[in-house]
From Swiss-Prot:
Stored InterPro entries: ComplexI_Subunit6, NADH_UbQ/plastoQ_OxRdtase_su6, Nuo/plastoQ_OxRdtase_6_NuoJ
Stated family: Belongs to the complex I subunit 6 family.
Main location class: mitochondrion
Gene Ontology MF: a single term: NADH dehydrogenase (ubiquinone) activity
Protein name: NADH-ubiquinone oxidoreductase chain 6
Length: 175
């Protein structure tokens, strides 16, 4: 069952990535990136990286939502162009979806895809977990290192996101 959840999240991830460059309006490009980021975080959570998935979701998607929210509020169009309003953009989007669908069908029919890795069927996409031999897990040690030794990194990252939002607001407003 979990293999199918990851498979569906992978399809949503690719659809979001196809929808991002074929954007007719900047609002939909940001939406494609946010959908892809959420699906990627879901895949990381499914493979056992609960803290990593949560941190990526909060920091990356939180920062993107703030930036895209402010920029679309400052430079919004009254009637934004959608994917179906331009036949070339719609055709490119549908062509990308069709190519992804054909690649998935080829892999599901026990075909072999050999680019960098060799996939022969859907079972090869599953990551097999190994049991930890230590007392502490890797994620707990990473959290401890982030908040003890890397506290200034967290502060600088938060401040950089704030300054980025202020700069983008000033640039889009023309001030």
């Amino acid at each position: 069952m979990m293999t199918y959840v990851v498979f569906i999240l992978s399809i949503v991830f690719v659809i979001g990535l196809i929808g991002s460059p074929s954007k007719p309006s900047p609002i939909y490009g940001g939406l494609g990136l946010i959908v892809s980021g959420g699906a990627g975080c879901g895949m990381v959570l499914n493979f056992g990286g609960s803290f990593l998935g949560l941190m990526v979701f909060l920091v990356y998607l939180g920062g993107m939502l703030v930036v895209f929210g402010y920029t679309t509020a400052m430079a919004t169009e009254q009637y934004p162009e959608v994917w179906v309003s331009n036949k070339v953009v719609l055709g490119a989007f549908l062509l990308g979806l069709m190519m992804e669908f054909l690649a998935v069908l080829y892999v599901l029919k026990e075909g072999e895809v050999e680019l960098v890795f060799k996939f022969s069927g859907l079972g090869d996409w599953v990551v097999y977990g190994m049991s930890d031999f230590g007392v502490f897990s890797g994620e707990a040690m990473g959290v401890a290192a982030l908040y003890s030794y890397g506290v200034w990194l967290v502060v600088v990252t938060g401040w950089s996101l704030f300054v980025g939002v202020v700069v983008i607001m000033e640039v889009t407003r023309g001030g």
